């Protein structure tokens, strides 16, 4: 595999260049703005192209070395797209509501994930010993936990990289990433603060077609990273197959 390709035409057709109304802008976005039309800021796609390519490379490199990417997008038009892209690329997501402390208080979140797993086990069977009302309450609790944590249930620990749609809406997620030193890839619209983002992608963060394009490209970059990781593992395994490693590995076990 290779990094996913995209063209300027694709970005234009998806409406990536359309920012917000000029009076809603963040002046820090001035370097990324081409101009305005009918009181709408037009983002400079000649900058978006290389920055998007760089973001895709960061995602692929992170996954290739065994890292985890967390997709974050809780706004209505991003929610389903975010979950689909993360699932398709074997990554993780938050698409309902960002719970304060989701990264910075991982221990508490882990306890909630354990509770979700327990409920999954209980309800996978017949949930014997429970009344109909008790079972209904368990199902409601499970549904609530799954909506909040289902996308990170198997993540294991905090991610190595975060990809964010709408930096204003997900400001708490970005603050937590900063505190933990987790790098952030994010789409920055004309009303955003680019200073908070390690790998910015100037572009529209509201249009469903634009969101779908970003998420598809990021997911494919993650899949490229998985392919590279597996390729590297294949080379290692091949090298080991020719060397007499088995006895060397067994020696410590015998002495233990």
Swiss-Prot record:
Q: Name one Pfam family in it.
A: Ribosomal_S2
A Gene Ontology term for the protein's cellular component: cytosolic small ribosomal subunit
| PROSITE patterns xrefs | RIBOSOMAL_S2_1, RIBOSOMAL_S2_2
Q: Which GO terms describe its biological process?
A: translation
Q: Which SUPFAM superfamilies match?
A: Ribosomal protein S2
Q: Which domain of life is it from?
A: Bacteria
Q: Which GO terms describe its molecular function?
A: structural constituent of ribosome
InterPro entries with a match to the protein in the record? Ribosomal_uS2 (IPR001865), Ribosomal_uS2_bac/mit/plastid (IPR005706), Ribosomal_uS2_CS (IPR018130), Ribosomal_uS2_flav_dom_sf (IPR023591)
Q: Which UniProt keywords apply?
A: Ribonucleoprotein, Ribosomal protein
Q: Among its keywords, does the record have Zinc-finger? A: no
Can you tell me which family this protein belongs to? Belongs to the universal ribosomal protein uS2 family.
This chain's protein is named: Small ribosomal subunit protein uS2
